């Protein structure tokens, strides 16, 4: 049986949008970043949800564009002494936990995540203390402190497999922070999952009625859905999975049109994978509803060319990720469990 923890819904203020750059400014910052990466012995590690021009720059400079699991692996294994993490803050923290000897920089430390913000350590720790018989599994989209309180860290690409494994051992689960992903995992595994009530501001906005209307316009299109989406959206999907899994599904499915229910940043790499297919954004508004994120994380959008150049050039407290040594040791244990488990799955 799945029991749901009922917490108060929160609305987070969005950061201001970066000032648009003209073509000359973009070229200036691209060249500056390339030079600074070489001078700093640095490599870019970018998430699929960053803007296309950031992903393109990571490609051009020998960096990584991936989901959070592969970002963690890449940064730990790469020979660079400095990692420039283009993403949100928990990704930078994870990189520092796995690579403490490296200098981990971010374009801005103000790049948050609604899942991270929605799972403050004091409240979450008290929640765990109230259920001492449960194994604590937290999503990668959490702070270092929340990871340190967990038994396991997990990404969406291996979430179902891990919960199946723990359920086979007879363990009852606390899942945090994303309630939609928790619901999806519970439905797939039938495990005893007690969910924290967080949500991703992007995926939470996908609308069932509007998606139904879009499907009528494109009846032959396949629907690809990230499991951070509401259950009603997941139930309409032809394929459900993490960002990397959705890109694989786009290649595997025979459909020529794909409706994609995740952050539109994924379109850059997905379109590369299927250049002959048409990608359509799943609607986040319609039927009288409006959207706030409109299928793009506002904190991911903070990773602009100017901010990346400033992060590499200035470093310091405004850009460098620091994780307390004791906290790092505690958070490293569940992270290593995740990586070891993922290795057994060969993902």
From Swiss-Prot:
Cofactor remark: Binds 1 [4Fe-4S] cluster per subunit.
GO cellular component: cytosol
Cofactor requirement: [4Fe-4S] cluster
Keywords: 4Fe-4S, Cytoplasm, Iron, Iron-sulfur, Metal-binding, Pyridine nucleotide biosynthesis, Transferase
Name of one Pfam family that matches: NadA
HAMAP family membership: NadA_type1
Pathway assigned to this chain's UniProt record: Cofactor biosynthesis; NAD(+) biosynthesis; quinolinate from iminoaspartate: step 1/1
Protein name: Quinolinate synthase
InterPro entries recorded: NadA, NadA_sf, Quinolinate_synth_A_type1
Cellular location(s): Cytoplasm
Stored NCBIfam families: nadA, PRK09375.1-1, PRK09375.1-2
Catalytic EC class: transferase
Organism: Salmonella typhi
Function statement: Catalyzes the condensation of iminoaspartate with dihydroxyacetone phosphate to form quinolinate.
Family to which this protein belongs: Belongs to the quinolinate synthase family. Type 1 subfamily.
Any GO BP: 'de novo' NAD biosynthetic process from L-aspartate
Catalytic activity: iminosuccinate + dihydroxyacetone phosphate = quinolinate + phosphate + 2 H2O + H(+)
List of residues binding iminosuccinate: 47, 68, 139-141, 156, 226-228, 243
Molecular function per GO: 4 iron, 4 sulfur cluster binding; metal ion binding; quinolinate synthetase A activity
């Amino acid at each position: 049986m799945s029991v749901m923890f009922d917490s108060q819904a929160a609305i987070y203020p969005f950061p201001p949008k970066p000032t648009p750059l003209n073509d000359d400014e973009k070229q200036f910052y691209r060249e500056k970043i390339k030079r600074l990466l070489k001078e700093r012995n640095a490599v870019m590690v970018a998430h699929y949800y960053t803007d296309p021009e950031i992903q393109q720059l990571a490609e051009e400079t020998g960096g990584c564009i991936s989901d959070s699991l592969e970002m963690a692996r890449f940064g730990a294994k790469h020979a660079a002494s400095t990692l420039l993490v283009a993403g949100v803050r928990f990704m930078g923290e994870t990189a520092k936990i796995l690579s403490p000897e490296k200098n981990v920089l971010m374009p801005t430390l103000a790049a948050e995540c609604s899942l991270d913000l929605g799972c403050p350590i004091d409240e979450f720790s008290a929640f765990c203390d109230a259920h001492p018989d449960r194994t604590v599994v937290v999503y990668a989209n959490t702070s270092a402190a929340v990871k340190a309180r967990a038994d396991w860290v997990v990404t969406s690409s291996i979430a179902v497999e891990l919960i199946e494994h723990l359920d086979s051992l007879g363990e009852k689960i606390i899942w945090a922070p994303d309630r939609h992903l928790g619901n999806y995992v519970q439905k797939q595994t039938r495990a005893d999952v007690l969910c924290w009530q967080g949500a991703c501001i992007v995926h939470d906005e996908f609308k069932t009625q509007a998606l139904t209307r879009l499907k009528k316009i494109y009846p032959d299109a396949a629907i690809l859905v990230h499991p951070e989406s509401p259950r009603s959206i997941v139930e309409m999907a032809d394929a459900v999975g993490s960002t990397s899994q959705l890109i694989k599904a786009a290649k595997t499915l025979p459909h020529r049109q794909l409706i994609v229910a995740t952050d539109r940043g994924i379109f850059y790499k997905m379109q590369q994978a299927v250049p002959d297919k048409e990608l359509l954004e799943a609607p986040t508004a319609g039927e009288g509803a409006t959207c706030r994120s409109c299928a793009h994380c506002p904190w991911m959008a903070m990773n602009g060319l100017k901010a990346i150049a400033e992060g590499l050039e200035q470093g310091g407290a405004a850009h460098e990720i620091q994780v307390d040594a004791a906290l790092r040791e505690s958070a490293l244990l569940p992270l290593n469990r995740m990586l070891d488990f993922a290795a057994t799955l060969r993902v």
